[in-house]
Amino acid sequence: MLSVVPSPVLVRAPSKVNLHLGVGDLRPDGYHDLTTVFQALSLGDDLRISPASALTVKVNGEGAAEVPTDRTNLVWKAAVRLAHLVGRAPLVEIVIDKGIPVAGGMAGGSADAAAALVGLNELWDMGLGRDELSALAAELGSDVPFALHGGTALGTGRGERLLPVLSRNTFHWVLAFAKGGLSTPAVFAELDRLREHGDPPRLGDPQALMQALASGDPAQLAPLLGNDLQAAAVSLKPELRRTLRAGVTAGALAGLVSGSGPTCAFLCESADAAVAVAAELAGAGVARSVRTASGPVPGARVIDPES
């Protein structure tokens, strides 16, 4: 009897921007308590997952050489974890086409891990629900559960405990990618250092920001955007100050460093305004490249190869 080889599965993984990122003091276990509001954005990575004779991970696109393709990659770990759960060997090839900047503060690695869970669940016909996949996602990393769910959400703990947040509009963003990345642990360590030597401003409660999201008004949302890690990212990469100024000068409503950086995200009034801001930023020479994106969008999901 002939066995049927499953067709490859294509999965889209969204990037994210932290609209609010409040960072608590360093805990004894080396982590920080976070209060964050995530929004999933249309800029994303695509993963193609196919049956193979051995587990392999391949990466294409800008920054591909900086992404490990061995067992240290979160995608590799996701495949091994899911295969172990069902008692099978992880015999798949996973090809990642990068759209999310590497080490850019937009959770590209976490998004890819979430996409791997979704794609393998489909390829292997496991029938796992989102809650079961979420539990696996939380074991892989604190940003992976949000990449799985997408939309807009409030994250607490290390960011892995999620509550959906009502967002009544599509918000339009311009993303300025910096030359070179920033290490997330290095940015947190720099924040700890800055706090030891002074008292950089800390964000308060995100309630007003969540009300602005529910209103759907970007002008109401703009002044409420904030990131406790921004001071540390700018301290390590001072040229980000110029990028942030340039985006607002170009017409953005507000700008902030995304997550641990160094990508800068600019909220705009409309899709047309975002195109205009992106064009001006691209000509200003303050970023390696510039993209537009919108959100919120769904989390990691299987897509039609033709889409």
From Swiss-Prot:
User: What's the protein called, per UniProt?
Assistant: 4-diphosphocytidyl-2-C-methyl-D-erythritol kinase
What family does the entry list?
Belongs to the GHMP kinase family. IspE subfamily.
The reaction(s) catalysed by this protein are:
4-CDP-2-C-methyl-D-erythritol + ATP = 4-CDP-2-C-methyl-D-erythritol 2-phosphate + ADP + H(+)
Q: Which PANTHER family match?
A: 4-DIPHOSPHOCYTIDYL-2-C-METHYL-D-ERYTHRITOL KINASE, CHLOROPLASTIC
A Pfam family this chain is assigned to: GHMP_kinases_C
According to its UniProt entry, the protein's GO biological process terms are: isopentenyl diphosphate biosynthetic process, methylerythritol 4-phosphate pathway; terpenoid biosynthetic process
Species in which this protein is naturally found: Nocardia farcinica (strain IFM 10152)
Could you say which residues bind ATP here? Answer: 101-111
Q: What is its EC number?
A: 2.7.1.148
